[in-house]
Amino acid sequence: MTFSVQHAEIHFNQNHIPVSDQFDDVYFSNENGLAETDYVFLQGNQLWERWITHKEANFVIAETGFGTGLNFFAVTKLFREFRQQHENHPLKRLNFISFEKYPLKITALLQAHLAYPQFEDLSAHLQRYWPSLILGCHRIHFGETTLDLWLGDVSENLPQLGDYMNERIDAWFLDGFAPSKNPEMWNDDLYNLMFRFTKPNGSFATFTAASAVRKGLESAGFNVTKRKGFGKKRECLSGLKIQSKSTALSTPWYLAQPAKMEQQDVAIIGGGIASLCAAISLVKRGAKVTIYCEDDSLALNASGNKQGAFYPQLSDDNALTVDFYLHAFSYGRQLLDWAIAQNIAFEHEFCGVALCAYNKKSAVKLAKISQLGLPNEIFQMLNAEQLSEKVGLPLNCKGGWIEQGAWLAPRQFVQNAFSFLEKQGVIIKTSQKITALSQLEKGWELKNMQGQKYCHEVVILANGYKITDFVQTEKLPLYPIRGQVSQIPTSENLLKLKSVLCYDGYLTPANQLKTSHCIGASHVRDNVDRHFSEQEQQENQQKLQQNIAQPWTQDVNTSDNLARVGIRCSVRDLAPMVGNVPHFEQQQADYYNLFNLRRRKQPIQSAINFENLFLTAALGSRGLTSAPLLGETLASIIYGEPLPISEGILHNLSANRAWVKKWLKGSKVE
């Protein structure tokens, strides 16, 4: 498996316009690229006029060929002007999906952006979060506009929008290099997928009027119109989807279903990192969020450690899980930057993470990761001398280096970020153990231990291993894992530690006061005892000293017995869960014979889930990395917006995946 893409090879012509060496074509008009964008795409799709009459909260544009981002900048600026002039309009958000096979190098991007200083704030933000060369979707927020930049071939990525995106796109910018220069992109598969994903009365616009393109779009189902071309071009095309075609769902058992809500009233059960990240993404969309936390304070369970590592899980044999973590890592950094910009205080250090090849098994794992072709800023193998230099202390083994890794203080982050959200209107109820959920005609009733009842339109379960305490979720294959993290005093040697050190455990650099480190963590499945264990305390010390046989490790001393225990939530395949809560009895009735239904090519209905009930779960030991993208994915599903992950990743994170895998094989689910 590989996750990398290639950079574009370009040069700049005498007009300072970027030209593709791969396709021998300009990125935008030599005459006036911005004027061409306005005429061909903004006017061609009649965006302003359609926004005026739009009745939904978001508008979705998809584009083939991101290039320098000129089209995106132009439409984002136009949308900002629209929002300023129509503050009370129902249309609040713009989603822009773009596909780019060969992304520009950052140096070329910077040079190309010099031509349009009027977009300086947008281009600077894009440059800051310009993605690594990782295949798939990279979500970047620009206020009320969200960019989903899909890197890789559009013929591979566009189908990954999946069943969920059927008839959800309002307008298309059919851009890219000319059909004569890039015939592979301009084909019937593209046009048919465009039609499938376009809303009724949705539109497209393109700079070309090539006969093959026109006929292909008409054959797909679009009503195509010729209009005057831009500049020296005689004609260009635009069109509408007037009539829908029924499209069979490819995986109806995994279909994500948005919430039905009028008041945007959302309850989240849980007080940790999963709950926080869902709340952040919901608040940005205007939701009214209420948090129900069982403890008397937030972040007292798995999110309560003093220090935690931030880096992706790359050693999984499941390519979709690795793919998720690569994108979660990138998106998580964006969220941390947002928190810092909001002056949310939390200890952190972007110091890198070292993964030690401390035995044969770990060396094999790291060798497999090195074959994924990841960019150096994500992962690179280093010899013992190089890794020791990064870590700041001598090591006797080679290992992997994650340059963009970090540590942060989870409890500080969660508590202070929730305090920030509270000022934005989020209601936080502590000492509220919700014991039962009852479905209402519209929404859910929550009942606490004292018998008090609360009603909300939408409920999200984000309470870790206790998610299965409800009758609606008791069949989910989740289990608890006890983890004890030791807090140790620093020393002259340990103060030299410059990065997070991972082996069969982990050791963090000193905290910001330079007084202590965290070392952990024990791993005891199906154990929810939160009392201190002297044995696990000693094991945390012994693992380091056995795995990293260096004299400096003798400075590690856990005898003060300072530690905290958290209970993590996990699942056998180690991938998180996010999305709708599946209705087990209904799905069992519909899918127990799924193997034969597929074999006989009989119709299969969409999955029945509990309406307006969602979860984000099984974050395991990587919650700091996974929670931000899980929260954003969940908010996108709830609001019926484009997702920041591929259909394949969504299936891999679906709560019913273990059941479906059995039903697809003809096996029983107990």
From Swiss-Prot:
The keyword Lipid biosynthesis is annotated on this UniProt entry: no
GO cellular component, one term: cytoplasm
Cofactor entry: FAD
Residue ranges of the region described as tRNA (mnm(5)s(2)U34)-methyltransferase: 1-242
Presence of keyword Transferase: yes
Segments of this protein annotated with the region FAD-dependent cmnm(5)s(2)U34 oxidoreductase: 269-670
Subcellular location: Cytoplasm
Biological function: Catalyzes the last two steps in the biosynthesis of 5-methylaminomethyl-2-thiouridine (mnm(5)s(2)U) at the wobble position (U34) in tRNA. Catalyzes the FAD-dependent demodification of cmnm(5)s(2)U34 to nm(5)s(2)U34, followed by the transfer of a methyl group from S-adenosyl-L-methionine to nm(5)s(2)U34, to form mnm(5)s(2)U34.
Similarity annotation: In the N-terminal section; belongs to the methyltransferase superfamily. tRNA (mnm(5)s(2)U34)-methyltransferase family.
Name of the molecule in the record: tRNA 5-methylaminomethyl-2-thiouridine biosynthesis bifunctional protein MnmC
Protein source organism: Haemophilus influenzae (strain PittEE)
Gene transcribed to yield this protein: mnmC
